[in-house]
Every structure is written in structure tokens, then in C-alpha cells.
Amino acid sequence: MNEINRSPDLEMVVLKEISSAIVNERNGTALLRHILDVLYRRMKMLRGTFTIRRGNDLMIEASHGLDEQEMKRGHYHVGEGITGHVAETGRPHVIEDISRDSRFLNRTRTRKSGEKVAFICVPIIHLQQVIGTLSIDRAVDRDTDLERDQKLLEIVGNIVGDALAASLQAHEERAALVAENEKLRELLTTNPGELI
């Protein structure tokens, strides 16, 4: 179970742990997972995701509380659902109870019917461009302050922008290398003389 501490210092504890992870973790996806782990332990987060924008699509890059199949289902178009709307507008969005909001798509199929859970989604911006989103499902009780949580997640999203941009760049470089290798294999197979 996550250890929630709603003291006035919660934000400082979360930011200190995340900034330490940013300094020490070089792998972008591992860093994003570490950040989600901090949010789980400190904020009553049930599930969380970082998405990366690729063209007009958003794909889950890292998650907490989702298995591989659920992550694969977490594919959105910009403008679609809450996550897509946040990516389109660059503005955060809070849903106090996802079971009562028809805009919430539950694409990953991880939410149970009737489960009272809040959803907070914030944009991740790098060089004035929305490059992804950070979203969490959060348990709600009488001490929940969703506005405070949203503000904290906005700060986290702002400081993670560079790391997510690096992860996006690594994906693009990897895709370019794979495409180049495929092209070379095809040339080698069909026209080996053209390689000389």
C-alpha cells in the first residue's frame, strides 16, 4: 500500500525524490517509471501513465499499475478522450469521479464499474510543444485535494519535459536505424551488387 502523507511538505518530498531520480537515471523510460513509483508511494495513486506524442497519436511510454496488454490498449489520437484533449489543448484536466464522466474512455480497461476514482491529466511540454501527458488515477477520500494534486503534477510534468523529449528522440533514432537495416537487408537479398 502506498504511504500517503498529506503534510504541507508532501510536495517538497515528491519533488526532491523526482529531482534525485532525474539526476541519477539516464534511461528515459526507467526514469518515467521511477517517477510513477514516487507518485504511487506518496499520493495514493492507483495507476499512472506517461504518454508520448508521435504525430497525431499518443502511446503509453511508461506506466504503474498497468500490465503490457493494458499499456498496448492505451493508444489515443490527439483530441480523443481526456488524454487526447489535454495533448491537443496543452491544458490540464481533472475528473473528480471517472464513473460519472462519459468523456473518460477507459481505453486500457483497468477501471472497474462504479469505482470512485479521480483522474488527473497534465500536458508535458518541451520547447513550447506538447510532447506527451502525465496522468494518474487517484483514490478519493475526505482529505483529497485534487487542485493541489493537479498543481503538483503540473510541476512534475514541467520538470520531466526534457527526459520525455530524450526518450522520444531515442525512439525516433531507433526507428530510423530499424528502417535503414531493413532497407539494407532488402538490398542485400535482392541486389547484392548494388552495395559495392
Give residue ranges: language-model regions.
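Signal-transmission linkers at sensory-effector interfaces
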Residues: 1-30, 41, 61, 131, ...
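Regulatory loop-to-helix N-cap segments in sensory/regulatory domains
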Residues: 1-7, 137-154
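Acidic/proline- and glycine-rich, intrinsically disordered low-complexity segments
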Residues: 69-93
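GAF sensory/regulatory domain recognition
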Residues: 37-40, 47-74, 99-100
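A short, aliphatic-rich beta-strand micro-motif
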Residues: 117-125
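Signal-transducing coupling segments at domain and membrane junctions
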Residues: 59, 68-69, 96-118
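Signal-transducing coiled-coil/dimerization helices and immediately adjacent hinge/linker segments
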Residues: 168-196
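Allosteric cytosolic regulatory segments
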Residues: 154-162
